[in-house]
Amino acid sequence: MRIAQKDLAPLLSRITDIRMAVFSSWPYLYDGNLDDEHKYLQHFTHDPESLVVGAFDGEALVGISTASRWETHPENLLSYLPGDWRAVPVTDILYLAESVLYEAYRGFGAGRAFFREREAFALEIGRRYVAFAAVVRDPNDPRRPIGYRDLVPWWRRLGYAPIPNALCEMEWKDHGRDKAHTHHLQVWMKEL
């Protein structure tokens, strides 16, 4: 369900907990900190054309998904779009920033609902495209859990496709590292 901006402030600590828990695992391995998380989430409390969708178990928030205008995302994602994609006006793209859900709640439809809500929101604010960036890791990385289920087939079933040669770069600190380093993410897009 959509979370109204006026209702976000009391949930920010819980949202931060969920993000840090989920992003600490494969494939992100993000070693986050509360200050960076709170700064990042402030955007969603102020931009009327951003969205936070929550998954709840009763009153308990167990997952969130966000979206914001492509042009307001902190990273300059447009610079990573190759060739013809640069002709697409940035005002036509909604960036699907993240979907994070506690593992015990996966496989029951929350992920599909996250995409459905964000796609509907994109159309409501006049966006023709939705895009996200997925971290790229070596499939032979020894940190990859046995039995990890790759989301690529599922994203394709939802109608998303990777944009060839659209690899963006973002920095974050992995668990077990002393400092942040560059990670590559594949941009995926869907026309609505």
Predicted features along the sequence, with ranges:
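A short beta-loop-alpha structural element at the N-terminal edge
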Residues: M1-I15
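Helix-loop element at the rim of GNAT/NAT acetyltransferase active sites that forms part
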Residues: D17-G32
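Active-site rim helix/loop that mediates acceptor-substrate recognition in acyltransferases
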Residues: Y28-D57, T66-R69
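Short hydrophobic/aromatic beta-strand element in the GNAT-like acyltransferase core
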Residues: E49-G54, I64, E98, L185-V187
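Conserved acyl-donor/pantetheine-binding loop and adjacent beta-alpha core of acyl/acetyltransferases
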Residues: I64-S99, P142-R143, A166-K179
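Conserved hydrophobic beta-strand within the GNAT/NAT acetyltransferase core sheet
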Residues: L96, V130-A133
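Conserved acetyl-CoA-binding loop-helix of GNAT-fold acetyltransferases
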Residues: E98-L101, G107-E124
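Conserved active-site alpha-helix within GNAT-family acetyltransferase domains
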Residues: L123-R128, V136-N165
